Amino acid sequence: ANGKTIVELPIHWLLDDAPNFVYAPVANRLGPMRNPNEVYGTWAAEFEGLYRYGRAFTLTMHPQYIGRPGRLLMLERLIEHIKSFPNVEFTRAIDVAKMWA
């Protein structure tokens, strides 16, 4: 109606920090919280699969979950791993959406 396009960027629980690191008894999320090394392995494998097929790797992160020292070290290691692949771009979600609009 207004000439604007809606673009939905795919997300997946597997690439969200919340299911891995939330401990919230009031929400019936009692853990166990995963070890950052386990999460690294999952996220690295998912990146490699998405890279192989030329797809976007979209992490969903919340500062209150990913923002712990050990988790940030894991995230830094993951970023270095991703940067080791040729032709990888780190792009804002809005810029990816504009590519498809």
Regions found by a protein language model. Name each.
Residues 1-53:
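Active-site-adjacent pocket scaffolds in enzyme catalytic domains
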Residues 33, 37-101:
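C-terminal domain-boundary segment and adjacent tail
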